[in-house]
Amino acid sequence: MRVQASVKRLCRNCKIVRRKGVVRVICIDPRHKQRQG
């Protein structure tokens, strides 16, 4: 899980999701998981 100021899609399987006010990226590749913080 990467914590970044600006989250971006790294591939076409990445999806940007808002959960409880936190922007996250979910993907089939676990290395692409990100959270905005």
UniProtKB/Swiss-Prot annotation:
This is Large ribosomal subunit protein bL36. NCBIfam families: rpmJ_bact. It comes from the Bacteria. Keywords: Ribonucleoprotein, Ribosomal protein. GO terms for biological process: translation. One of its GO terms (molecular function) is structural constituent of ribosome. InterPro entries: Ribosomal_bL36, Ribosomal_bL36_sp. Belongs to the bacterial ribosomal protein bL36 family. PANTHER family: 50S RIBOSOMAL PROTEIN L36, CHLOROPLASTIC (PTHR42888), LARGE RIBOSOMAL SUBUNIT PROTEIN BL36C (PTHR42888:SF1). GO terms for cellular component: cytoplasm; ribonucleoprotein complex; ribosome. The lineage of its organism: Bacteria, Pseudomonadati, Pseudomonadota, Betaproteobacteria, Rhodocyclales. Disulfide bonds: none annotated. It comes from Aromatoleum aromaticum (strain DSM 19018 / LMG 30748 / EbN1).
